[in-house]
Amino acid sequence: MGFSGSRAWSKWLTICLAITHPFSVTAKSAADYYVHSLPGQPEGPLLKMHAGHIEISPETSGNLFFWHFENRHIADKPRTVVWLNGGPGCSSEDGALMEIGPYRLIDKETLNYTEGSWDEFANLLFVDQPVGTGFSYGSTEHYVHELDEMASQFVTFLEKWFEIFPHYEPDDLYFAGESYAGQYIPYIARAVLDRNKKQDVQANNRIWNLKGLLIGNGWISPQHQYPAYLPYVYQEGVVQAGTQEANLIEAKAAKCMKELNVEDTTGTVHIPDCEDILQAILDYTHKGKRCINMYDIRLTDDYSACGMNWPPDLRDIQPYLRRKDVVKALHINEEKQTGWTECAGAVGSSLKARNSKPAVELLPGLLEEGLPILLFSGQKDLICNHVGTEDMIKNMKWSGGTGFELSPGVWAPRQDWTFEGEPAGIYQQARNLTYVLFYNASHMVPFDYPRRSRDMLDKFLGVDITHIGGDPADSRIDGEKGPTTSVGAHPNSTAAAEREKEKLNTAAWKAYYKSGEVALVIVAIAAFAWGIFIWRSRRKHQSSGYRSIYPMLGLNSTGSLGQISHKHSRRNGDIEAADFDETELDDQPSQAFLSRSSRDGDAYAVGEESSDEEDGASDGQQPMFDQSRGEEGRS
């Protein structure tokens, strides 16, 4: 080979190495995502977590952020619940740190365990999506505009996620979320079912076991939910009918209805004229500098936030997720140059879904394919209120019936639900669809009632703890118990561990107290006997002259008291130890459950923990940025 040929070969080899080098460097394994420590974590073993970015579109630098929590126990089979918040453009870290996740913030620095978190019997996967939401990032020019784009993007994410974490792919899979996720979830479910039908997926045995959907206070059917604003506020007494202000709201509602009756808009997700109804209601409630909270009508907020500052945990979440040590712990890419915000206005502005049909049109097909769906509503939410959801269900047709018809003209009953003796809500179900109304709950039901929402989840997933033990929750539908569920009272749950630890400490103190009482009695008896002995010795001394006061021991007085005192002390120690009944402690459960590795055991293991370790993260915060909740604000 001549010089020119050699140079060409060298150049070709250099190009090949340049092309292949990035792939060899950037390919990641599960160990790269392992969360070794979490700043502010509560005492006790760290829950098994993975977090970080997965690139879904190299050409647009599109990266989605995820935070995964492994289940604490497996009741009968492994399950994974994927949680999505709405907006559009609102981060699912809302769900992780304020709703269904295992931790909640006490302040900007400190996390605490949540009793009733959804990770007890299911793996939880929180995803900031679409691109641009929360910790996710990418080219702003390529933010998604339609719901089918969003679903395609999410399926790509799942494909890549399961390649890194293949041991979770066979799990029963559920999608859950709230608010605008009522649009996301049906579209994603449809995309997953269509994917499962592909020949290459079936040939490679990579079918995803989609088992159900859960949507809370979902924005699903604009055609039914926009008109529900007015009857809801009348029903709840927020607006007084017949007033001048009420007439103004009714005029806005009439204009919306006119738009909804136009054929071109019946299949539209976002209708600006209809958005004016909610704004008119908020203006009506404007008193001084306050207005009603659109997410919980029992509360007020600064005007014109009207709920954007709620829940109160928000003031701590943004500073916490912008701390440098937290950013490092969660493996946030350096390419993510802006700090975390709850809702990205640019994402919401882009995703208007002008050519997307509302998700309500997908629900009948999903139900008819045998996919169970649960819709739940908080009674005190205005923005995605239960009146609109119930009207949507009432008019929806699937599987040969309308709404909750069991047969023509016969409707499934609304069943009373009680939880631990208190009225909790209503259940209604037919033909794969379940509806749950939570009494006295807001837009974010798990924020208000984590234990009740977990009970609902366990019922829907079919979790039954009968064969693994635990204190069952007293949850009844029309007075009857269903499968035995445990909400924070499982013997290996974090909350139960704290209770058992307290029991153990109490038992120990009782045992010590009891042994102390016995020792006191022994000392009193010994003192009395000593007094009698001295008295008798002195009487002898008075009758026969001075002798040692320890005549029977054959000891002189020098140093003898110390020796007898020593013997008495040892004897007392033996009696005290003998009187300490160790069975009182043996009756209490072992502290072994306080260690995650020992409490889970092989029976509950899903995958293996990474052995990699990292140095502790450094403290500090990133600069603060403005926060928006998106235009719709349906987070």
Swiss-Prot record:
One MF annotation (Gene Ontology) recorded for this entry: serine-type carboxypeptidase activity
Segments crossing the lipid bilayer: 515-535
Keyword Zinc-finger: no
One Pfam family per UniProt: Peptidase_S10
Segments on the Cytoplasmic face: 536-635
Membrane topology reported for the UniProt record: Single-pass type I membrane protein
Bias kind Polar residues: ranges: 483-495
InterPro entries given in the database record: AB_hydrolase_fold (IPR029058), Peptidase_S10 (IPR001563)
Gene Ontology CC: one annotated term: trans-Golgi network
Membrane side Lumenal: residue ranges: 28-514
GO BP field: apoptotic process; proteolysis
Residues that carry a glycan: N112, N432, N440, N492
Gene3D superfamilies the record matches: alpha/beta hydrolase (3.40.50.1820)
Reactions catalysed, as given in the entry: Preferential release of a C-terminal arginine or lysine residue
Disordered as annotated region, ranges: 472-500, 579-635
Active site: S179, D381, H443
Stretch forming the signal peptide: 1-27
EC identifiers of the protein: 3.4.16.6
Cell compartment(s), UniProt: Golgi apparatus, trans-Golgi network membrane
The keyword Protease belongs to this UniProt entry's keyword annotation: yes
Keywords: Apoptosis, Carboxypeptidase, Glycoprotein, Golgi apparatus, Hydrolase, Membrane, Protease, Signal, Transmembrane, Transmembrane helix
Family label: Belongs to the peptidase S10 family.
Function, in words: Protease with a carboxypeptidase B-like function involved in the C-terminal processing of the lysine and arginine residues from protein precursors. Promotes cell fusion and is involved in the programmed cell death.
Name of the protein this chain belongs to: Pheromone-processing carboxypeptidase KEX1
Species of origin: Paracoccidioides brasiliensis (strain Pb03)
Gene: KEX1
